[in-house]
């Protein structure tokens, strides 16, 4: 039977690790439905900008980059604010906010009033709400799932992510072809509403976090970064993950140009090349737990962290035809399988190393840094491709990735941190 402890933690339905508890089940369900909604609407805004508003490449690029970067900046003060609020109401509020602003797009389209500025504002609001939700969700997960089961929980989230990445875009593309360009945005909005209902159903008490100061001070905005950069265990993990993700994502637009333009692949071939390898994420996420049980967390973290950066340089050698398509799929499968192992292990270690009263600030700072780094590197690699050529820019990113294992943690952590004292929170 499920039970609720005095601290508001929902205990496991089944003893012995077979169940992660009713509360986690609802959290996982909420994550699943919103993730599938988001992947259904993958690249929906650029498509709407092109198909409905006749936007050119510069405006489409600005829409993607500005939404990411401005949303991240807007979210900076929200991490410290979320830390000292009950997390589930924050998650529900951000879900409902995303639902409302996304529904404004099909509504404006139906009324003939949709404009580029509205798409830009909606993308900024959704990006900021997404960062805020993730910060609160990390704290919620740590409260719902006991330490030894965190890896299993993160493995389930990772498997869900790659399943949605594999199935969502093709289904979304078919829906756009049948029903028009805004249908997937409406579906994404509904997914956030369902997510809010799932979080509401978690049940159990949630105590109000306590802090010494009654008001948020300007210095509190940097608390997350101060904690991460001062931690000898978290700092290398932070620098490695942010840089690797940024370099991988920076080449995504360049690969589209290379494959769809220079090499003449059809759009369906391009979609297939990146959809099928997502099976690697399912394989990797299922292997993470058994690998850690056999070889230990630190060894699996470092090995998968190294393996994930060995693949992207191969994308610089893609050629036309079936051989080129197979090369891309093989490289992406290896990359995604390695990431599928690495991500749940790294996410688990990050939560284990972060005191409960600092999780929201830490995750917010982490996500903001990741999004800003990705936006900056994407813009930089676009300029680099214009100067050196697309293939050369892809190769350079791959070579730089080979140096990133130097930033991986050298030593395993030995114990979980104790909660920091309220006075330290300012």
Regions found by a protein language model. Name each.
Residues 1-426:
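Alpha-helical transmembrane-bundle signature of multi-pass membrane transport and export proteins
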């Amino acid at each position: 039977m499920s039970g609720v402890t005095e601290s508001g933690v929902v205990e496991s339905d089944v003893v012995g690790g077979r169940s992660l508890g009713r509360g986690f089940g609802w959290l996982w369900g909420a994550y699943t439905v919103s993730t599938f909604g988001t992947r259904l609407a993958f690249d929906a805004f650029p498509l709407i900008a092109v198909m409905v508003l006749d936007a050119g490449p510069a405006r489409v690029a600005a829409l993607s980059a500005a939404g990411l970067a401005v949303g991240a900046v807007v979210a900076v003060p929200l991490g410290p604010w979320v830390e000292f609020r009950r997390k589930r109401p924050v998650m529900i509020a951000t879900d409902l906010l995303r639902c409302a602003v996304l529904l404004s797009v099909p509504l404006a389209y139906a009324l003939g009033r949709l404009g580029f500025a509205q798409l830009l504002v909606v993308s900024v609001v959704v990006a900021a709400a997404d960062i805020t939700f993730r910060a609160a969700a990390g704290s919620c997960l740590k409260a719902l799932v006991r330490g030894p089961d965190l890896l299993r929980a993160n493995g389930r989230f990772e498997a869900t992510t790659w399943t949605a990445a594999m199935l969502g875009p093709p289904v979304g593309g078919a829906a756009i072809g049948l029903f028009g360009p805004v249908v997937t945005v409406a579906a994404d909005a509904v997914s956030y509403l369902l997510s809010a209902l799932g979080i509401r159903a978690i049940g159990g008490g949630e105590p109000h976090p306590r802090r010494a100061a009654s008001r948020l001070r300007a210095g509190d905005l940097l608390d997350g970064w101060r904690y991460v950069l001062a931690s000898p265990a978290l700092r290398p993990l932070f620098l490695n993950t942010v840089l690797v993700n940024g370099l991988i994502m920076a080449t995504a637009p360049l690969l589209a140009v290379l494959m769809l333009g220079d090499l003449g692949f059809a759009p369906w071939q391009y979609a297939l090349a990146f959809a099928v390898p997502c099976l690697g994420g399912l394989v990797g996420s299922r292997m993470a737990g058994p690998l850690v049980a056999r070889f230990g967390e630190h060894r699996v973290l470092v090995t998968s962290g190294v393996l994930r950066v060995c693949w992207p340089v191969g994308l610089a050698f893609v050629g036309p035809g079936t051989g080129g398509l197979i090369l891309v799929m093989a490289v992406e499968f290896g990359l995604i399988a390695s990431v599928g192992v690495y991500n749940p292990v790294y996410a688990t270690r990050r939560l284990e190393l972060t005191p409960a009263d600092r999780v929201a600030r830490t995750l917010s700072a982490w996500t903001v840094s990741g999004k800003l780094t990705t936006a900056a590197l994407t813009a930089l690699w676009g300029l680099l491709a214009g100067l050196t050529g697309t293939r050369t820019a892809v190769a350079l990113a791959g070579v730089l990735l080979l140096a990133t294992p130097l930033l991986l943690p050298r030593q395993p952590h030995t114990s979980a941190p104790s909660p920091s004292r309220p006075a330290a929170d300012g």
